[in-house]
């Protein structure tokens, strides 16, 4: 849902966003740390007015001296490799539902190409909140909440 009702989500979303926080919680409210990107990853997210987007995430304490095992893609999510995840493609918005559907045209992980991801989004001022229902690497359900700040 777009908090600023005078501007539809499809318009308010356009811009460059920097990740502030990324938190995963189990249905019982327990915090879960994603080992592939860590508790506090870097991230940039871009949406243009023509329906194109790009997303990049990197583990803040990325260790270049060892090989990190790639994680499995979870439902409604992509797959990180070596502490990094990136994908791009096209998007559509549902201003009434407050959701964005992303179609992955390219991705770091081949198996993510063609994937369709739907995200619940809320924009208030220069902050974007994305909520994703997905699963931990163990398969247990989690809700991921990402807080972004507009930087462009």
How would you label these PLM feature ranges?
Residues 1-152:
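Lipid interaction determinants
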């Amino acid at each position: 849902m777009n908090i600023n009702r005078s501007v539809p989500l499809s318009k308010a979303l356009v811009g460059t966003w920097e990740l502030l926080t990324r938190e995963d919680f189990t249905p019982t409210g327990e915090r879960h740390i994603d080992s592939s990107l860590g508790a506090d990853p870097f991230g940039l997210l871009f949406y243009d007015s023509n329906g194109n987007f790009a997303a990049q995430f990197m583990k803040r304490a990325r260790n270049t001296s060892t090989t990190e095992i790639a994680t499995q893609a979870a439902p409604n999510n992509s797959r990180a490799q070596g502490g990094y995840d990136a994908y791009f493609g096209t998007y559509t918005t549902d201003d009434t539902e407050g959701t964005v559907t992303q179609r992955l045209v390219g991705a770091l992980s081949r198996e993510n190409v063609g994937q369709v991801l739907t995200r619940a989004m809320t924009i208030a001022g220069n902050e974007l909140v994305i909520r994703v229902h997905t699963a931990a690497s163990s398969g247990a359900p989690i809700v991921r909440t990402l807080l972004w700040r507009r930087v462009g």
